Amino acid sequence: MEQINHEYHMEGILIKGRVRYKDSCPVKGAIVILEKLVPIYNEEVQEQKYEGTYLEHGLTNDQGEFCFSISDRMSSYKIKVFDNHHR
């Protein structure tokens, strides 16, 4: 699958992308999950990790495209993609 693109807007961030197979065919109906990365500090080992917190999900269209709108520009996010059809 292909890397995700992003665009920046004044009021927030619009994240949109296209999911494709290695042969460039679009992945139709793939589940796309948006997570906000929340820092978790482990006192015992004095290490900070990030845990994903679910925000929303969607499905890719016939061209393999998806889109999310985010208002919190100061946070980090993770996008997970799952192929429903297992081509």
Spell out what each predicted region is:
Residues 14, 29-31, 76-78:
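Exposed beta-strand and adjacent loop surfaces of beta-rich binding modules
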Residues 85-87:
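Short acidic/polar inter-strand loop motif in beta-rich domains
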Residues 40-65:
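Short, acidic Ser/Thr/Gly-rich low-complexity loop/linker segments typical of extracellular
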Residues 8-10, 59-61, 72-74:
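Surface-exposed coil/turn segments at beta-strand junctions on protein surfaces, enriched
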Residues 22-49:
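Short, ordered, surface-exposed loop/turn motifs in non-cytosolic proteins
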Residues 81-83:
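Conserved structural position at the C-terminal beta-strand
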Residues 67-78:
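Short Pro-Gly-centered beta-turn/loop motif in secreted/extracellular proteins
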Residues 1-28:
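Beta-strand-rich domain onsets/edges
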